[in-house]
Regions:
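Noncatalytic, helix-rich "gating/capping" subdomain that lines the substrate-entry/channel surface
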Residues: 1-245, 249
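Intrinsically disordered, low-complexity linker/terminal regions across diverse proteins
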Residues: 94, 118, 122-126, 135, ...
Length: 369
């Protein structure tokens, strides 16, 4: 029953001590595949639970008090909140012990392990994957093959799920819901959450005003829709065309440079030229804008309820567009108004959003040089 609950709330990212989702297969970049990877640590890194230097110990103690303070805000007594804290810390520390370090997670080969659903269910019988996925609207045919990032973590999690009490798992799920909902609830709840995450963890002095937080949330949930408005004002189609021409010229120049290199062998040159020719270039804004007509914001509902609606929309959209389907190379991983750029090695694409293509970085009237 608890895993049914994990699956239901997993749509919102609640209560599931592992990550799941669809993404490009790193060894077959044209297709999406189901991925499972370690997760479940509120503090993110295993060292916060296991290291004993003074700084880490102080953060861990502050985290324990944070848990108690939050549960009390939700109507639990001091004693009940402390009991919840102890159960949560026991479970998360057990997760930390089986988690890989950040350094280990950077090993691409070690974190790419292809499994069949049959193999997964045989190796991890206490992780009811089909049940978890069904609760999120993921059909079995889309998880017949998957990439398991950290098999040893899942083996440890499988044992934990077999030995942990219902009270421990329930407390962990309750905490995950409370913790992740905190920013969308009352000012009192938000203040306690800010005190730990922003002040204790990051050294911030004061919280942003509510209007800035709200603006940021609109950006996070409907960023591409805002980007469309931004581009209409600050990045016309003529600028997009100009930048695409400039990039094309750079590709031609780089092609000639590669051909002229005396230190490169002919097979190496061919591989370099093939990769350059295969670059997928994204400039300014998407050629096709996302359809957000099914995303409903209801002014009669609370901020939190509307946030859940947004998260559900994007979860369903990801499943619909990616489950069992080829990678959409036209999908953008940054909003047009973002002042940044990226290269995605899996899909061999470069992206320059309109936000970075402003003066002094880019001037459509300037000379190429």
């Amino acid at each position: 029953d608890l895993q049914k609950g994990e699956g239901k709330y997993g749509v919102f990212g609640y209560g599931v001590p592992m990550g799941m989702g669809f993404g490009a297969d790193e060894k077959n970049a044209k297709m999406n595949i189901f991925n499972i990877y370690q997760g479940g640590l509120t503090l993110g890194q295993r060292e916060y639970y296991l290291d004993n230097d003074q700084t880490t110990a102080d953060i861990r103690n502050a985290y324990k008090q944070f848990i108690v303070d939050m549960f009390k805000l939700f109507g639990f007594t001091e004693q009940q909140a402390q009991q919840k804290r102890d159960l949560i810390m026991r479970f998360e520390t057990a997760l930390a012990l089986i988690s890989k370090s950040q350094t280990e997670l950077r090993d691409v080969e070690a974190n790419y392990n292809k499994f069949t659903l049959k193999q997964f269910e045989a190796d991890y019988p206490n992780i009811h994957l089909q049940q978890l996925c069904a609760a999120q609207g993921i059909q079995p045919q889309y998880i017949q093959e998957m990439i398991v990032g950290q098999p040893a973590f899942l083996a440890g999690l499988d044992k934990l799920l077999a030995t942990q009490t219902a009270d421990e798992l329930r407390a962990y799920m309750e905490w995950d819901v409370i913790n992740q909902a905190a920013n969308y609830l009352s000012d009192d709840v938000r203040a306690v959450s800010f005190g730990f995450y922003s002040q204790t963890m990051r050294g911030a002095k004061e919280d942003q005003p509510r209007w800035k937080r709200a603006t940021s949330q609109v950006e996070g949930m409907m960023g591409e829709a805002l980007g469309r408005i931004y581009c209409e004002k600050y990045f016309p189609a003529s600028s997009k065309k100009r930048m695409e021409e400039l990039i094309g010229n750079l590709q031609v120049a780089l092609t000639e440079r590669i051909k002229a290199q005396t230190w490169m062998s002919e097979p190496t040159k061919k591989n370099a030229l093939d990769k350059l020719a295969a670059f997928y270039v994204k400039v300014g804004y998407p050629n096709t804008w996302k359809d957000l007509s099914a995303l409903t914001i209801d002014p009669q509902k609370s901020y939190y309820e509307n946030m859940l609606s947004c998260v559900t929309f994007w979860s369903n959209e990801a499943i619909e567009k990616k489950a069992g389907k080829p990678v959409d190379r036209d999908e953008w991983h940054m909003t047009p108004q973002t002042v940044n750029a990226y290269y995605n090695p899996t899909t061999n694409e470069i992206c320059f959003p309109a936000g970075i293509l402003q003066y002094p970085f880019f001037d459509p009237k300037a000379d190429d040089a």
